[in-house]
Amino acid sequence: ITVPSTSSKNLQNSLAFSSSSLSGDKIQTTSFLNRRYCRISSRAPIVVSPKAVSDSKNSQTCLDPEASRSVLGIILGGGAGTRLYPLTKKRAKPAVPLGANYRLIDIPVSNCLNSNISKIYVLTQFNSASLNRHLSRAYASNMGGYKNEGFVEVLAAQQSPENPNWFQGTADAVRQYLWLFEEHNVLEYLILAGDHLYRMDYERFVQAHRETDADITVAALPMDEKRATAFGLMKIDEEGRIIEFAEKPKGEQLKAMKVDTTILGLDDERAKEMPFIASMGIYVISKDVMLNLLREQFPGANDFGSEVIPGATSIGLRVQAYLYDGYWEDIGTIEAFYNANLGITKKPVPDFSFYDRSSPIYTQPRYLPPSKMLDADITDSVIGEGCVIKNCKIHHSVIGLRSCISEGAIIEDTLLMGADYYETDADRKFLAAKGSVPIGIGNARIGDDVKIINSDNVQEAARETDGYFIKSGIVTIIKDAMIPSGTVI
């Protein structure tokens, strides 16, 4: 359960609506031989139509060969998730619950499936049991039909005679499993993060990569000056080719990273508002290029964003930017996680919507009954499946699966992650007889007259033995915690 500093027995969470608009111009390129990286004869001009690169709903993609046979999706599960602790105490970061019914990993997997990419690996090395269980239950082993041999598989870090160490970074994680990835007869690898919230058509991303004859294509997010200092920025030439990188620049270095974003499809007005482009940590990399970069050019590089991609630019590879102008959020901290979840309750239009029929978000079928609300006052909230809510007040909150909320509770600006199971009547009677608290919210047991309001506006506190943490002023009740009756946090 996560709660802000001004809520009463509350926790928060939000999701957001996304859309994107991209376009391109005529581009002329010269080629680099993928394996040897020597300059060869120049190619004929390549025309990238605005529709082809656009992420608008009216545009069409004509990939040949199609993505289901020619693209391998690789989702990086991230590190230990220390900034999301205690949510990552017993689970990998991609397995953290999201939007009442989902988990973070459902976002990139659903984007892949909606983009006709059905061969997907998820790399992880921390607390992967719940992630593995969720993926095996949510996604069939023959997705896309037997012809396309679709799958979603978890690859956990493992030691071997060649690699005695755990994953040292994003690039090292991919390098350790290159022996498996290169067995697939594909043209490109699509590298994704497992902790981002957005909706994107990867087919158009791949199409832009092919039409510009790029070796690597980096998804780029337009930025204003205020946000730009927190991201790794890129500079492009008039063809959309990346020529320079800067990690979280400030002052004169920041000004030097301004680019003309109309090159990537923004209109003049928006280009003035957003004169910077930031890397989203999402890449399309041609297969031969990936093998050469990780094994021969940069065998000691551990990270894509800070080492491999800038290194590829320095040796003359064609590294293109692909603009994504839609909602995107990095769910890397408690504050970002809380705000993104509560964003789905935003009026009149949420930041991210799960109600998009054209590109749905998939998850594990749980076969839960409809939620039951008895004399409850609920406003501006999202309620998950299988909840029982009795005579209480809920405002601007997200209520997770199987949540049982009893009479008199007041929940505002709060995210409840839900419970893993229901307690039987016999269990509840037994607990009541010995003075204990029945399960209710997210496997946490919260007694009568408890107030979780952070009235002192504490910003940081670690009270794990008491069952809660405070980060950025947001109170998080940990899983399986028991908060005794009358407690004030």
From Swiss-Prot:
Instruction: Answer yes or no on keyword Cell wall biogenesis/degradation.
Output: no
Q: Name one Pfam family in it.
A: LbH_GLGC
User: Which keywords are on file for this protein?
Assistant: Allosteric enzyme, Amyloplast, ATP-binding, Chloroplast, Nucleotide-binding, Nucleotidyltransferase, Plastid, Starch biosynthesis, Transferase, Transit peptide
GO MF, one annotated term: ATP binding
Q: Does the keyword Nucleotide-binding apply?
A: yes
Q: What is its EC number?
A: 2.7.7.27
The record's Gene Ontology biological-process terms are: glycogen biosynthetic process; starch biosynthetic process
| Chief subcellular location | plastid
Please tell me which top-level EC class this enzyme sits in.
transferase
Say which family it is in. Belongs to the bacterial/plant glucose-1-phosphate adenylyltransferase family.
Oligomer status and interactors: Heterotetramer.
Protein known as: Glucose-1-phosphate adenylyltransferase small subunit, chloroplastic/amyloplastic
Gene name per UniProt: AGPB1
